[in-house]
């Protein structure tokens, strides 16, 4: 019998027998078996328990199997034969219609009235079946006709295009030769036939080169180009002006007017979606080798063309092609100034009836609490999942830190750290923190930067290492370290095996020895210079490993242990002033936030529950149970709010005040995997501040936060006697 029958019978039984369901002792035992048959051999594993305990596992396995079956069915499509109606009917019957991916404008935020009113967000990878239009053909149809026949008024570009852009955005920005390399012609023709039958769905399993060819074919098959026949010559004239220095500024004004005032609304929306996406591709040209110039050459001819009625002049054709490429390149390079935000994604009639505070934008811009989140950049380059990020600045003449020349370090699970310029988001260099050639490699636990001498500290299974902000190795202490925290007294507290090591920052230089730079030690973390080996004070904790720490108030450090114990230490006397049991199996994440002169410590871990403690009373103020989001991967305090990354790939923002139990926002869609690190980065140019998200999908997304002009942005983590944010000692990645 099918497993669906068991699930339906269970639901009926559960609805009529609540007393039994609530008492597992009276429930009959069931067994789940995994059987693998390979040749003549059979392998199996079984698990026995009650209905209630095993039902979530059964549902999860059943959903995964169904999803995989759909993927296999999708790959087994055949090319439809126009001369055979029977084969066409067979194809229609066997096609599996999946959910179309949401557009970048619809990715992932669900506002909440309270925790009690949970709403289900749709993952970009989990798609619901769309209703197939009566005439589902996509290729060769005018843009206005195509959009008019789609029932949804929220999305003002074709669903087929939106799905391709989102799948490429989530999974393929780093693919070498994106839009330049072609896919298999047979696969392209198969997929084109499927699309014209109404299946517009895409997934991470799709060949990105097939998707890019389909997108270019769609644009070339339009009866009229996106930039229209009527405006073709005007766009080329704007290209000439921009290319001529004396009238360059006027040329950009002409181009901006052509885009925002002269183009039909549907054409403008689609053009902005496309250029917006190409901008993200170009940002990662060091990885995909597709910069603005290369992209303009392969994409420009799909945006601009004009049907010639007479014989072609090769010289004129070459000159025109150069202008088309140039104007496309300029749109990619100057996207932010040429395109008006927000992009209109609803019809004018619908837009006029929407509330003033709504924001129907195609670029993901999300409003909450008087703020607007807008994606600014997406950075690639890591080959493994990102575990930690930290912001560090440069030291001034007094030895204090300042943000000028600041860096962001991102550290992946393979022990490779990439260093970025925090302001222009440009990659600077890569440093090997863990020597993977030694003893099978090592594990990464935590990374922080200090506010006193602006050094970067990394805790791994091999050693505790100290770096300058540019990747020079200053010193190291052999042995495993799990958690890090900078105290209020110019010290670094390090959680090791059954011991707390405390190192003074006095005497530790902020710059590595000249003969021991990261260039000298990029293979094994050791150069020719004499490395510092600081000696610390030890607080022995028999049988205890501190998994997470954070500093609180003027002289407190709070920490959570592997034995589910919460500790509070006095940083001056080094004494334990409070100790209690915490109801969390593996408390690995901590953050502190100050609300109305009281500091609250937020703690989470593998169980997915959130516990909020009052720093004055040491009492549990509030507990938020796991609402189905599973493990907690990061907790950060940003602008009077708590930002938490969960296993379900969602970042949820909570008000810092535990009395307010609402979830302000569910932020999801810029990553295909868990967000494992969150940091705030001020904008030194005086613009909107940034939040950086590091993910297990090996990428970093950077969101700018536009604050309501009536309110002022408050950097929660800026230390009052310093000019830059401090680093929280969140936790180890044990």
Curated annotation (Swiss-Prot):
Residue stretches of each WD repeat: 381-430, 539-579, 585-623
Keyword field contains Repeat: yes
Domain of life: Eukaryota
Main location: cytoplasm
Domain Rho-GAP: 141-339
Alphabetically ordered keywords of this record: Cytoplasm, GTPase activation, Repeat, WD repeat
GO-annotated biological processes: small GTPase-mediated signal transduction
PANTHER family tied to this protein: RHO GTPASE-ACTIVATING PROTEIN 68F, RHO GTPASE-ACTIVATING PROTEIN GACL
Subcellular location field: Cytoplasm
Gene Ontology MF, one: GTPase activator activity
Site residues, Arginine finger: 180
Annotated protein name in UniProt: Rho GTPase-activating protein gacL
Gene that encodes it: gacL
Induction notes from the record: Down-regulated by phagocytic stimuli.
Gene3D superfamilies: Rho GTPase activation protein, YVTN repeat-like/Quinoprotein amine dehydrogenase
Pfam family, one: RhoGAP
Gene Ontology CC terms: cytoplasm
General function of this protein: Rho GTPase-activating protein involved in the signal transduction pathway.
Stored SUPFAM superfamilies: GTPase activation domain, GAP, Quinoprotein alcohol dehydrogenase-like
Annotated organism of origin: Dictyostelium discoideum
